[in-house]
From Swiss-Prot:
Major localisation: cytoplasm
Residues the record lists as binding S-adenosyl-L-methionine: 190, 223-226, 242, 262, 280
Subunit structure, as described in the record: Monomer.
Family: Belongs to the class I-like SAM-binding methyltransferase superfamily. RNA methyltransferase RlmE family. RlmM subfamily.
Name of the molecule in the record: Ribosomal RNA large subunit methyltransferase M
Name of one Pfam family that matches: FtsJ
EC code: 2.1.1.186
Length: 360
């Protein structure tokens, strides 16, 4: 098994290919990418043996922007016999001997064509899991060092990649997609973007510390209040900045102040530091990056989540340009952590999280 299979949103295969090639090169690993546009996944094949496993350990999954999942796979299994699809899969795993495996995922790429296989995948999972357990696998705990999950990626009927992922360095979700329910009282579906971002960037055991009733936040471009809703739900008092109307249900909470201003000109009251800044404005990504950079360098907020709307072409290049802008925070003596992700609820955009850790 000397390939990586990485899942993504259909249409972003080239961006993911560029990203994984760069990340591998930074670790001194080289290879080539096989991709089909609109397929929802890419294959990165390493030139040297065992390098795919090395990448799966050393590339921090949380630092991959366009990947929903990252697994090590072998050669594509084609034309699985309908009478016995399991034996060829077991044969591939026998070369691995996955003793420290804990879970099984039988998945497809996130495309309409591939998702037609999901009913089959669900039915196939049970007998395959039983066969794997008979081999002595799938008996480990997630907490065991270097424990893995086994992943089968069906790309079309009778055709799959067999692989695994390290539990400490992967998405915990089936197909790499968190299943979130739209809150009936939320003002807009955009609320799911911020909810997924918080789930992605903030450890669950830190959420109450990072979001609570003693905190204040700012939502730039808040109308009608989808992102404000997520902050208010977690107890924050929010300055909702927008010329447009904010949902009456948010006003009724008593936890917001509607500031009818331009988000690019707004400054925090009395220039006091806010705990949170969130922003989902439709604007050029570089202009948004410059705006967020201003807030961070002026000390107007400690933590921020914002969206960057991507251009139609050279999207990966634009992301690199925008994120490189935040290097100036280091020049200002600020220590920070930055993560960016193309979330499931994002479309032609990525979501970025930055937290200021202190000063040098």
């Amino acid at each position: 098994m000397n390939k990586l299979a990485l899942y993504c949103r259909a249409g972003f295969e080239k961006e993911l290919a560029g990203e994984i090639t760069d990340k591998a090169a930074q670790l001194g690993v080289f290879g080539f990418v096989n991709l089909t546009e609109q397929s929802g996944y890419v294959i990165f094949e390493c030139y040297q043996a065992n390098e795919a496993d090395h990448l799966a350990r050393e590339i921090k999954f949380e630092q991959l922007i366009f990947a929903r999942q990252m697994i090590v796979v072998g050669e594509l299994l084609e034309d699985l016999p309908t009478a016995d699809r399991i034996s060829p899969i077991i044969a591939q795993y026998k070369t691995l001997q996955p003793k420290h495996s804990s879970a099984l995922f039988v998945e497809t790429p996130d495309t309409n064509e591939a998702k037609a296989l999901l009913t089959f995948c669900r039915k196939f999972t049970v007998p395959l899991r039983n066969s794997l357990k008979q081999e002595g696998w799938l008996t480990s705990s997630d907490n065991v060092k270097d424990s893995i999950s086994l992943h089968i990626l069906f790309i079309r009927p009778g055709c799959c990649y067999v692989g695994y992922a390290y539990n400490h360095n992967k998405s915990p979700f089936f197909m790499g997609i968190p299943r979130l329910k739209f809150p009936s009282d939320a003002p807009s579906r955009s609320t799911l973007k911020l909810e997924e971002a918080i789930l992605t960037f903030i450890p669950i055991n830190q959420e109450k510390k990072r979001f609570n009733e003693q905190m204040k936040g700012v939502d730039l471009g808040a109308c009608p209040g989808g992102w404000t809703y997520q902050l208010v739900k977690r107890g924050l008092f929010v300055y909702a900045v927008d010329h447009g109307k904010i949902a009456a249900t948010l006003h009724e909470t008593g936890r917001i102040e509607h500031c009818v201003e331009d988000g690019f000109k707004f400054q925090p009251p009395k220039l006091k530091q806010m705990d949170w800044l969130v922003c989902d404005m439709v604007e050029r990504p570089m202009r948004i990056s410059q705006l967020i950079g201003k807030w961070l360098m002026n000390g107007w907020c400690r933590e921020t989540i914002f969206n960057l709307k991507l251009p139609m072409k050279k999207r990966y290049h634009e992301v690199q340009l925008c994120l490189s802008l935040f290097r100036q925070l280091t020049k200002q003596g600020l220590c920070f952590k930055l993560q960016a992700k193309h979330l499931y609820h994002d479309r032609e955009e990525i979501t970025v999280h930055i937290v200021i850790m202190g000063k040098k």
